[in-house]
Amino acid sequence: MAFSPLVDELVESLRCLPGVGQKTAQRMAFHLLERGRSGGTRLAAALNHAMDGVRRCDSCQNFSDTEICQICEKPERRNGTLCVVESPSDLLAIEQAGDYKGSYFVLMGHLSPIDGVGPEEIGIERLLDRVRREGVTELILATNPTVEGEATAHYIADRLDGQNILITRLAHGIPVGGELGYVDGFTLTHAFRGRKPLSE
């Protein structure tokens, strides 16, 4: 590139973000340098602060700036229900829906032997220990409806077989307002298998 090494370094650094290629990184860098210097300074400070201060909650593995996150600190959330998700963004989506009032465990991934991700890399033993220690009565497996997410859910369920815990899986199916002609076969199959009486 025909720019300063500092500009090149900024562009390369921005490329670490998901979905950001060379051109997008250049546009971002040029915007920050041309018109957004105060925003760029705030962004740099916030990044430094977050990278230094954000850790994983000791209880659920979600992002937190304290040993125990705000959700795990609330006694009313420890109601015997534990929801297992793959990522903090999944937890956030459930929280924003506003209906679930239990606690969480964030795997920070899913099983993927091809990528070298086994049970120990995503904290399965920590999850199983927590389930037993806290007397969880219902475990909601809210992993994504992908091959890896399904495999992860089945692995966890198999490990807890015979433990007298209700193990549930989030329903999969047709989105509200969706049309059958646009739904993929995998989703349609799950919708048929998870159908319920109309009276419910």
Swiss-Prot record:
One Pfam family cited in the UniProt record for this chain: RecR_ZnF
SUPFAM superfamilies: Recombination protein RecR (SSF111304)
Species: Marinobacter nauticus (strain ATCC 700491 / DSM 11845 / VT8)
Gene3D superfamilies according to UniProt: 3.40.1360.10, 6.10.250.240, RecR Domain 1 (1.10.8.420)
Superkingdom classification of source: Bacteria
Designated name of the protein: Recombination protein RecR
Zinc finger (C4-type): 57-72
Function, as annotated: May play a role in DNA repair. It seems to be involved in an RecBC-independent recombinational process of DNA repair. It may act with RecF and RecO.
NAD is among the record's keywords: no
Signal sequence annotation: none
Gene that specifies this protein: recR
The organism's taxonomic lineage, starting at the top: Bacteria, Pseudomonadati, Pseudomonadota, Gammaproteobacteria, Pseudomonadales
Similarity remark: Belongs to the RecR family.
Alphabetized PROSITE patterns for the sequence: TOPRIM
GO MF annotations in UniProt: DNA binding; zinc ion binding
Matching NCBIfam families: recR
Domain Toprim stretches: 80-175
Gene Ontology biological process terms, A to Z: DNA recombination; DNA repair
